[in-house]
Amino acid sequence: MAKEIKFSDSARNLLFEGVRQLHDAVKVTMGPRGRNVLIQKSYGAPSITKDGVSVAKEIELSCPVANMGAQLVKEVASKTADAAGDGTTTATVLAYSIFKEGLRNITAGANPIEVKRGMDKAAEAIINELKKASKKVGGKEEITQVATISANSDHNIGKLIADAMEKVGKDGVITVEEAKGIEDELDVVEGMQFDRGYLSPYFVTNAEKMTAQLDNAYILLTDKKISSMKDILPLLEKTMKEGKPLLIIAEDIEGEALTTLVVNKLRGVLNIAAVKAPGFGDRRKEMLKDIAVLTGGQVISEELGLSLENAEVEFLGKAGRIVIDKDNTTIVDGKGHSDDVKDRVAQIKTQIASTTSDYDKEKLQERLAKLSGGVAVIKVGAASEVEMKEKKDRVDDALSATKAAVEEGIVIGGGAALIRAAQKVHLNLHDDEKVGYEIIMRAIKAPLAQIAINAGYDGGVVVNEVEKHEGHFGFNASNGKYVDMFKEGIIDPLKVERIALQNAVSVSSLLLTTEATVHEIKEEKAAPAMPDMGGMGGMGGMGGMM
């Protein structure tokens, strides 16, 4: 297929047109008074959203060069959301403003490479000032404020997220699910839970709830399949002398071994239960080690030179309470050494930092949560499917932004933090580097201006008023008042502001230093020819019908 090449100003102007269209669609969602965007779906009802990244993801333009510009900024919005959970609209507004200012200067003859260098220096200096101005998230109230703002000022969602984080800690896993009704709910699972239930319902101790509960129990951990009773008989005899219940976690327990355990359980000889080990392959081995660390036990594995026949009671883990239903096993109050658990947590955190796979990262974070806190499930309720999807997206974003706030701290919100940081930056640059520096200094005013415009105020007037003051002074777009942003609880995670600015400068630099674009030429398909009508004999005789 033939391809068309566009050069210099012609290419950059078309790229800018794509960025402008994306920006115009996304910017309306910004701030507490942001508007909704209605998105047509390929099937079913259209979706309504105030989430910038959800709008950006839907945009495809007909002009191939303009579409390339839009797709690059869309990628920035997505990466900002992935890294910080919020700030997608901020990143888009910044990218557009930087590109617009930069394009004007480059068209007038500025050197793109020098301009880029000045932009990078300005952004780095502003980020350093943001870090200095940030403060650590103190308590539940500040977490509620961050979550509320990220959930588009929904205080109920903010409170749910704060409650969840309080219960499972900053390393705990918080998942978001759809509720069956219209009310929002929070469920918290204490201890370590994995998705394996009892191997036989005859292990049940509570017939009403259909659960097996073992108190002050031993835990046998092995990566072997147990099919013969003689494999575990010596260990069973030793635990019977101790008079404590036993949970067996193995690759599988089948045949004679399972039958014998069930019969002895029913006769009251053994207080026992058995479940399959969680996970598969290498992940199963790691999860067994996690349980061993949590309970102070040892995985009995032939790889380590250990066999079930020769296993001692010292190899068994211990837990205060174990609850098993048909789908899940929960281990509460594991008796492992706290130092061993901390070491294991640190090891998993290192693996999370080094892995590039999103799937592996998610599974590692689940393991981390099970070791360090627990799992909280926020169940989102809504009256319709459209409302449910929109609300669930907001909760996901608010959750990520709140974690970002806990991780790196908070700054004043409402677009004021960037302006305050810029007021403290004074770089002595020359020529086109100075042009790049000034581009950033003007562009960082755009988020505050857009928040004000969406709330029905004059963006320029609001920016000028905020610039006259120092400290935590900013603009509350919800009521149109100038306030102390920290006192009013209008705050943003530092990580969100930092990543939004870094990503915006990065993509704008790429676009401004683009000198050519290459795209396929769409071949217009010729319209199908009219079918040959033939003679259509007999038509001439129609005159007699007059």
From Swiss-Prot:
UniProt subcellular location: Cytoplasm
Top enzyme class: isomerase
Annotated family: Belongs to the chaperonin (HSP60) family.
GO cellular component entries: cytoplasm
Catalytic activity: ATP + H2O + a folded polypeptide = ADP + phosphate + an unfolded polypeptide
Protein name listed in UniProt: Chaperonin GroEL
Keywords, sorted A to Z: ATP-binding, Chaperone, Cytoplasm, Isomerase, Nucleotide-binding
GO MF annotation list: ATP binding; ATP-dependent protein folding chaperone; isomerase activity; unfolded protein binding
Record-listed ATP binding positions: T29, M30, G31, P32, K50, D86, G87, T88, T89, T90, G414, D492
Subunit structure: Forms a cylinder of 14 subunits composed of two heptameric rings stacked back-to-back. Interacts with the co-chaperonin GroES.
Record's function text: Together with its co-chaperonin GroES, plays an essential role in assisting protein folding. The GroEL-GroES system forms a nano-cage that allows encapsulation of the non-native substrate proteins and provides a physical environment optimized to promote and accelerate protein folding.
InterPro entries hit by this protein: Chaperonin_Cpn60_CS (IPR018370), Cpn60/GroEL (IPR001844), Cpn60/GroEL/TCP-1 (IPR002423), GroEL-like_apical_dom_sf (IPR027409), GROEL-like_equatorial_sf (IPR027413), TCP-1-like_intermed_sf (IPR027410)
Matches recorded under CDD domains: GroEL
EC number(s) reported in the record: 5.6.1.7
Spans through the membrane: none
Organism: Helicobacter pylori (strain G27)
Highest taxon listed in the record's lineage: Bacteria
GO biological process: protein refolding
